[in-house]
């Protein structure tokens, strides 16, 4: 097996889907994650994903690897990164991984990992790599469950935020994972929402969901010019 060691970054793991992150590599990463979790007395890992085309398969490969160690998996489906972090406090499990390419090009994907409500450090990322290289895996048969944390996430925000007046806002979800929740959150806060590209689509047919690039903001700028909203909100994948 060829393992591109450059996928192991300072605080996450990322590379090109189906090349750097192929079935064998991702399954081994799952075995490494499950084994490391069990060594810390963590018996359950939450797994989430973004809307990228490669994410469902990568989720299957990763889950398979984790389950093969005896560690359990809780699948929470397509969520934003903040929703994933919320789940580690809301659910019984305080650890997990979200499969996301963030703002990187569509062919990329990656993993953000949390153990006991703490994001992994660079040293912990290297520990996962060493487990793969040394084949230091536990064996067992974990259990797969599913959970929906959308309602609890929305309720948490609504209880924490109070607006002085109803706002007219424009949101560009860029066909990313934000589309599963953004409009509903702001409507429950009392806002009038104009939503662009709220349907999650990993091909990103309208523009790439990276608001740091001016060209990805043009549709939102046009929307504001027409609607005169109080606030504009671009989102990442």
Task: State each model region's role.
Residues 1-64, 68-69, 149-167:
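An N-terminal, well-structured beta->alpha segment
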Residues 15, 53, 106, 175, ...:
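Short, glycine/acidic-enriched loop or turn micro-motifs at the edges of active sites
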Residues 40-116:
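Ferredoxin-reductase
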Residues 11, 49, 100, 171-174:
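Active-site flanking residues adjacent to catalytic metal/cofactor-binding acidic residues
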Residues 229-237:
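Conserved small/polar residues in nucleotide/adenosyl-binding loops
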Residues 109-227:
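Gly/Ser/Thr-enriched, mixed-charge loops and adjacent short helices
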Residues 94-98, 170, 231:
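Short glycine-aspartate micro-motif
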């Amino acid at each position: 097996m060829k393992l591109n060691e450059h996928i192991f970054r300072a605080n996450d793991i990322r590379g090109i889907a189906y090349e750097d992150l192929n079935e064998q590599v991702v399954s081994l990463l799952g075995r490494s994650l499950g084994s490391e979790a069990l060594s810390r007395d963590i018996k359950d890992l939450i797994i989430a994903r973004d809307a990228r085309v490669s994410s469902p398969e990568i989720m299957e490969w990763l889950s398979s690897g984790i389950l093969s160690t005896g560690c359990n998996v809780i699948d929470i489906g397509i969520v934003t990164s903040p929703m994933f972090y919320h789940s580690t406090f809301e659910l019984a499990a305080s650890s997990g991984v979200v499969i996301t390419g963030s703002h990187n090009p569509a062919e990329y994907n990656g993993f953000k990992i949390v153990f006991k409500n703490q994001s992994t450090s660079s040293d912990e990322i290297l520990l996962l790599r060493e487990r793969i290289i040394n084949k230091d895996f536990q064996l067992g048969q974990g259990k797969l469950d599913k959970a929906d944390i959308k309602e609890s996430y929305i309720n948490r925000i609504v209880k924490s935020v109070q607006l002085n007046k109803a706002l007219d806002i424009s949101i560009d979800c860029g066909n990313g994972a934000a589309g599963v929740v953004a409009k509903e959150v702001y409507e429950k806060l009392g806002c009038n929402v104009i939503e662009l590209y709220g349907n999650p689509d990993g091909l990103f047919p309208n523009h790439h969901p990276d608001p740091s690039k001016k060209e990805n903001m043009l549709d939102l700028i046009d929307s504001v010019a027409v609607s005169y909203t109080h606030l504009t909100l671009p989102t990442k994948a």
